Amino acid sequence: MTVTDIVLVLFIVALLAYAFYDEFIMPRRNGETLLAVPLLRRGRVDAFIFAGLLAILIYNNVMSQGALLTTWLLCVLALMAFYLFWIRAPKIIFKSHGFFFANIWIEYNRIKEMNLSEDGVLVIQLEQRRLLVRVKNIDDLEKIYKIMVKTQ
């Protein structure tokens, strides 16, 4: 097993751990889930660039008759990228004392101000940071509003 294979295995394990945490552990942390709202995906161009680079690496490895293990590891990495970029949907998860946004726990008492932009983006102002929540379905903004009013 070469250094390249070890690095690929480490990346695959890290992506698997992230996917497992995002799908199974995070919804169970910090109490019962009151609402989970799917968000719009960001970074489509980044996903295509990453997939293209992986395709180039797989092609080069096959054409130069590289190690079969490396080819398989690159294919597994491509499958993980496909899951993370195209199948998994980002979401905001509301709990009784706070919410998860981009896998970060934010308590409700940290919210200083909330606004809704004209294009349907919920802007949540924290102490030193602004969160831009772009929901997939515009009707979910009303559900978010009801949860915020109920829990505050």
Curated annotation (Swiss-Prot):
Indicate whether Transmembrane appears among the record's keywords: yes
Q: Which HAMAP family match?
A: UPF0266
Which protein are we looking at? UPF0266 membrane protein Ent638_2389
Cellular component GO terms, alphabetically?
plasma membrane
Coarsely, its chief localization is: membrane
* Ranges that cross the membrane: 6-26, 45-65, 67-87
Give the keywords, sorted: Cell inner membrane, Cell membrane, Membrane, Transmembrane, Transmembrane helix
- Where, subcellularly, is it found? Cell inner membrane
User: This protein's superkingdom?
Assistant: Bacteria
Which InterPro entries does the protein's record reference? DUF986
State the family it belongs to.
Belongs to the UPF0266 family.
Q: How does it sit in the membrane?
A: Multi-pass membrane protein
Q: What organism is this sequence from? A: Enterobacter sp. (strain 638)
